[in-house]
Amino acid sequence: LRPLVSSVAEAAGVEPPALRVRLQERKWGCCTPKNGIILNVRLLLAPKIVIRYLVVHEVAHIRFRHHQESFWAEVERLMPEYREAERMLKEDGWQWVF
């Protein structure tokens, strides 16, 4: 995951964030106040497109701490196909819960 996080951060023009992977009950990922990223260990069961989307989403939060239009424009710039990954996460995410 670290090479993916580093490459997305470089494309976003931000410093590569610290990465932690742990079991989270309610979230797939989050961006910490100190610009670190925490990803849910359950993502390891998800397709690569979904993992990439979550990394892109959280890296975008380093620059945009909201879900306004500018945030989504950055997500789309970094991953034009993000809507498909988001759909997969919403429809199929239950399958990756153990």
Where are these regions (language model features)?
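Active-site-proximal or metal-binding-adjacent scaffold patches in catalytic folds
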Residues: 1-53, 62-98
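Walker B catalytic acidic pair
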Residues: 58
